[in-house]
């Protein structure tokens, strides 16, 4: 199968960044020169667009997965999206997102309906969970205060 056919099949399943497409075509054993030609053609025809991929991924990560800006940025960088493209996509997507509400939803899901934090250990676990989800320490602290958490996870 040609690299072009493989690329079309890969892109028919889901949006891929340029790096992801190159990696997958390389994994399938296509020569570098053929991959370069195919990727160039895909870029010219707008079949491959890192900005579109970044916006779509950021919308899904924020809206469905309840992830914060910092984690989404890390994930976009891992996908091979250029930092400036990722920053622009995040600014566009997170302009419409209330980060406090996003933290509250992630916290509510993690607490499984419990109204209050019951211990210092639970507070620390929730704090670390929200950090891993890409939220800022200030936003996390404010959200934890609303569910009975202490002001600082380092207070013992």
Report each predicted region and the residues it spans.
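An alpha-helical, amphipathic repeat domain used for nucleic-acid recognition
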Residues: 1-156
